From Swiss-Prot:
Entry protein name: Ribonuclease HIII
Name of the gene: rnhC
GO cellular component terms listed in the entry, alphabetical order: cytoplasm; ribonuclease H2 complex
Cysteines joined through disulfide linkages: none
Organism: Staphylococcus saprophyticus subsp. saprophyticus (strain ATCC 15305 / DSM 20229 / NCIMB 8711 / NCTC 7292 / S-41)
Family: Belongs to the RNase HII family. RnhC subfamily.
Cofactor-binding details, from the entry: Manganese or magnesium. Binds 1 divalent metal ion per monomer in the absence of substrate. May bind a second metal ion after substrate binding.
Matching PROSITE patterns: RNASE_H_2
Length: 310
């Protein structure tokens, strides 16, 4: 099956939607309209990108968008420095996490599978290292990716996180268990005979990861660990965007629930916010929405004590 993606202007989209009927209700998040035309699925996204999927996708795209430059699959190898494997030339599962360095909010982990046919689509959509993307862009991209990329998203809420930490689990162990579980879930959704590599954004040495993962690694001989993996594998970049999306949406809901802006990270601003929450709702509530072992907790308590002792 061929996949073609174009970035359109509002005028282009209006012209396209005037040529054939589109469905504009009961759509996936991030989608503006969809239809099926002569066996080709056509999806228009809020980002003004349109995706044609089907064996005749290229011909249908050329027919309906005659004035738009044709997307061409790239056969050029990705440039590498120290990297020895050009992962984007292969079919990979990538995994990454979000929230591990944030006092507030959960730990989210995602594994995502990117096939040959989807590499160019992800590039056309603008999939990149999530650290380079705004939260708004992450939400926009993730809501498109989850509609067609096989993936598994796991969320460890603060109650479970604090329970495991109290039981002696390090954060590295938590991440290893979640990464391994997410990867296993994805292998059950794809034809693994077509899988070339499993690429994990490295947060621990391979031996440590394997020791902490609690169960055997699926396809251990195909598993690789890469530092700064998002820039080396588009599968990791996709997983990173989806895991970050889940974290961002959780933080948005938390902000609405607490009725105050909940900052990300572990800065002095976080200490001040935590102190305000202690005053308003108590330390137990703070623990229910945060990672209890972070130093921010003690700093917030000190701020509250100082306020009432001065």
């Amino acid at each position: 099956m061929t996949n073609i993606v174009h970035k359109l202007t509002n005028s282009d989209i209006q012209q396209l939607m005037s040529k054939i009927p589109f469905e504009t209700s009961q759509l996936s998040q991030g989608m503006k309209a969809k239809t099926k035309y002569k066996g080709t699925s056509i999806s228009i996204y809020n980002s003004n990108k349109v995706m044609f999927q089907g064996k005749d996708a290229e011909r249908i795209a050329a027919q309906l968008l005659p004035n738009v430059t044709k997307s061409q699959p790239s056969s050029k190898k990705a440039s590498t420095t120290k990297q020895t494997i050009s992962y984007n030339q292969f079919q990979c599962i990538g995994s990454d996490e979000a929230g591990s360095g944030d006092y507030f909010g959960p730990l989210t982990v995602c594994a995502a599978y990117v096939s040959h046919k989807n590499v160019q689509i992800l590039k056309a959509l603008g999939v990149d290292d999530s650290k380079k993307l705004t939260d708004t862009k992450i939400v926009e991209l993730a809501e498109q990716l989850v509609t067609f990329i096989p993936h598994s998203l796991l969320v460890m809420n603060n109650e479970k996180y604090n329970e495991k930490q109290k039981a002696g689990w390090s954060q590295v162990k938590m991440k290893a268990v979640l990464h391994n579980e997410a990867i296993k879930n994805v292998t059950q959704k794809i034809d693994t005979t077509e899988l070339d590599y499993i690429v994990i954004d490295q947060f621990a040495e391979a031996g440590v990861y394997k020791r902490y993962a609690l169960s055997d690694l699926p396809f251990s001989n195909k598993t690789k660990f890469e530092t700064k993996g998002e820039s080396k594998s588009i599968a990791i970049a996709a997983a990173s965007i989806i895991s970050r999306y889940a974290f961002v949406k959780h933080m948005d809901r938390l902000t609405q629930s607490v009725k105050t802006d909940i900052p990300k990270g572990a800065s002095n601003k976080v200490d001040l916010t935590a102190a305000k929450i202690i005053e308003r709702k108590g330390i137990a509530y703070l623990d229910s929405i945060s990672k209890k072992h972070f130093a921010n907790r003690k700093k917030a308590e000190n701020l509250v004590q100082k306020k009432y002792n001065d």
